Amino acid sequence: MLATKVLQQGEADRPWLIWLHGLLGNNNEWRVIASRCPEWPSLAIDLPGHGDSVAVVCTSFDDISAQISATLQMHGIERYWLVGYSLGGRIAMYHACHGEPRGLQGVIIEGGNPGLADAAQRELRLAHDTAWAERFRREPLAQVLADWYQQPVFANLSAVHRDALIDARSDNAGAAVADMLEATSLGTQPCLAPQLQQLAVPLVVLCGADDHKFQQLTRDAGLPLRIVPQAGHNSHLANPQAFAAELRNFLVNPG
């Protein structure tokens, strides 16, 4: 079973917000944003290999989707929104397309890739993620994290935010992170764009104004896009006030 943390009880008649963190994160990642949505009950999940779910094994997207469903059932949650960042966003998209749909009210994605349509691209990405996984298993975590956050997708991080992320992520277990990275590699994820376009529930993708790559990915996938100003890939960290405002607006007016 996945470890969880109830961030707030909210109002009993509202659906729950289920918060899914990115790779290397934990249930604390969404705390600031959830606090700006106090009307909604909020449950943050530790994904396999992370936080208090460090010993939980995950072998595939189907696996984590089933684990999420079991976790919601354990908590008696019948109506919910999924909110996911990066890896958490990809998991949320997969769950919405291939998981148990009962009770899902909508999906809010931050910087999540809907998938690669080209098989050759998927093979390249799987090799890329496998190489990173080997580094997480074999090298000192501090060194791997320092290199991880120098990747182009994180180019807009300020030095302060980059150092803070490295510090916060340093208590991860490298081997557990590696296992989850391989199990949920973008190279093993199907292209979800066609199904996401036909979802029976509302969906939106939030991207930082400076995250041009993921803005284009979202447009190419034909998905609804909203821009968070003064932010890059990790827009909920860079501009929490604006991110929370966009999220709240969509929850209230999902059409």
Curated annotation (Swiss-Prot):
InterPro entries, per the entry: AB_hydrolase_1 (IPR000073), AB_hydrolase_fold (IPR029058), SHCHC_synthase_MenH (IPR022485)
GO BP of this protein: menaquinone biosynthetic process
Catalyzed reactions: 5-enolpyruvoyl-6-hydroxy-2-succinyl-cyclohex-3-ene-1-carboxylate = (1R,6R)-6-hydroxy-2-succinyl-cyclohexa-2,4-diene-1-carboxylate + pyruvate
Enzyme Commission number(s) of this protein: 4.2.99.20
Keywords recorded for this protein, A-Z: Lyase, Menaquinone biosynthesis
Pfam family, one: Abhydrolase_1
One Gene Ontology molecular-function label: 2-succinyl-6-hydroxy-2,4-cyclohexadiene-1-carboxylate synthase activity
This protein's record includes keyword Oxidoreductase: no
Enzyme class: lyase
Pathways per UniProt: Quinol/quinone metabolism; 1,4-dihydroxy-2-naphthoate biosynthesis; 1,4-dihydroxy-2-naphthoate from chorismate: step 3/7; Quinol/quinone metabolism; menaquinone biosynthesis
Subunit structure: Monomer.
Reported function: Catalyzes a proton abstraction reaction that results in 2,5-elimination of pyruvate from 2-succinyl-5-enolpyruvyl-6-hydroxy-3-cyclohexene-1-carboxylate (SEPHCHC) and the formation of 2-succinyl-6-hydroxy-2,4-cyclohexadiene-1-carboxylate (SHCHC).
HAMAP family hit by this protein: MenH
Family from the record: Belongs to the AB hydrolase superfamily. MenH family.
Name of the molecule in the record: 2-succinyl-6-hydroxy-2,4-cyclohexadiene-1-carboxylate synthase
Organism: Serratia proteamaculans (strain 568)
High-level lineage: Bacteria, Pseudomonadati, Pseudomonadota, Gammaproteobacteria, Enterobacterales
